[in-house]
């Protein structure tokens, strides 16, 4: 039997509510030459019946006897995949019709790229928002230092990069498995994002999308592993300053505002001193953007926030237009407290 060029890999656990919509999005793809590998991770709801009713010959359903977890199901799917390209799919998201066609064309034209994501439309909380992530390999690497930069359900992965380097998902993680994999896979291949929304990403009211204490338990060790590339043994104060900047944490002490600004400069200097393991231009842009986001949270400190930001050399590189600068200044002048909206 000929191998299909693409394996669409979708684990599902008790996903009856949105499963059919996710499946229909894949079956409606303009690129038709794929196998659709569905791993039913021991579902106890109506998921097995829905999967059994699917008639498309491209669909293969593998059922786990027990609930093994997302990472284990994904690793199982990677072992079973026949396609040279693995397209990730989640059972509650929706792939737009041209997704596979555009990603396959990009991967075929860029042999050095091992992972390709896309933009996404975030929906499900009563409003829609476009998510844009950096497109180039350099910009993606700069953002990975602070957090995830590829939407998991938009990712297409070259299977050979995984198998040749003995890579897979960390089964000890309950979430952030994708962020962890991207940081490890980036040591072996280039990364890219198509700057076009080709996936609809569903946000759940009670999910762990975004920043929550539960998710931070898994994300923080990944962030600190990235930090140790520049600073092998960071102090507790340095870790605190770093996480404040990564997560745009609202701090209570005015001194912590200055600490975050000083920390951003320190990271820039460390990257230069270490021979630029992170691409200089893109890392500077990412640092300045995160510093602006952090300072913007602290306009209730008044002109202190404005002066600290302005004194920072990074302010000149911050991705903000004149209108944003004026609004930031006005909020500092008025000591606007965003937490009281």
Which residues fall in each region the model found?
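Cell-envelope/extracellular polymer assembly enzymes that use nucleotide-activated donors
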Residues: 4-7, 35, 180
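Short aromatic/hydrophobic "clamp" motif used to bind/position activated sugar donors
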Residues: 86
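C-terminal subregions of glycosyltransferases and related glycan-biosynthesis enzymes
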Residues: 203-341
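Conserved nucleotide-sugar donor-binding catalytic segment
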Residues: 71, 79, 118, 137-245
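Conserved donor NDP-sugar-binding/catalytic core segment of glycosyltransferases
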Residues: 98-130
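Short, acidic, metal-binding catalytic loop of nucleotide-sugar glycosyltransferases
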Residues: 24-33
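A conserved acidic beta->alpha catalytic loop
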Residues: 40-49, 66, 90
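Glycine-rich, basic loop-to-helix element that forms the pyrophosphate-binding segment
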Residues: 64-81, 102
